[in-house]
From Swiss-Prot:
Native source species: Pseudomonas entomophila (strain L48)
Compartment(s) of residence: Cytoplasm
Pfam family, one: PRA-CH
Residue positions binding Mg(2+): 77, 79, 81
Coiled coil start-end: none
Cofactor note: Binds 1 Mg(2+) ion per subunit. Binds 1 zinc ion per subunit.
Lineage: Bacteria, Pseudomonadati, Pseudomonadota, Gammaproteobacteria, Pseudomonadales
Official protein name in the record: Phosphoribosyl-AMP cyclohydrolase
Catalytic activity: 1-(5-phospho-beta-D-ribosyl)-5'-AMP + H2O = 1-(5-phospho-beta-D-ribosyl)-5-[(5-phospho-beta-D-ribosylamino)methylideneamino]imidazole-4-carboxamide
Primary residence: cytoplasm
Keywords: Amino-acid biosynthesis, Cytoplasm, Histidine biosynthesis, Hydrolase, Magnesium, Metal-binding, Zinc
SUPFAM superfamilies: HisI-like (SSF141734)
GO function term, MF aspect, one: phosphoribosyl-AMP cyclohydrolase activity
Amino acid sequence: MKDWLDEIKWNSDGLVPAIAQDHKTGRVLMMAWMNRESLALTAAEHRAIYWSRSRGKLWRKGEESGHVQKLHEMRLDCDADVIILMVEQLGHIACHTGRESCFYRVFEDGQWKTVDPVLKDPNAIYSAGH
């Protein structure tokens, strides 16, 4: 039987983009990268675990903020090069800016405008154990 991880078309860095969506509303919460280990751990632990390119290590979503993403379903696109994670976003904050979604700006009249409010000050999220 073929290993399910071998079916994925990893990029030259051994990564695949992963889009996290709210499992109830379908809203796109964020995009991050996954490597083979993080995707296998996500499936095993039923929570989103990404690969942080900037830190060069596994990133268990919510490990610092408490805003864990509980996995409900994973999907692979037709080209096998993008993953969608259908998640329950604990705390209703996916973005490090304190917003529900990382996609909080909309293009209007030739400019990017912020349309989603900050739900919690990022300084309060990432200080003294959330």
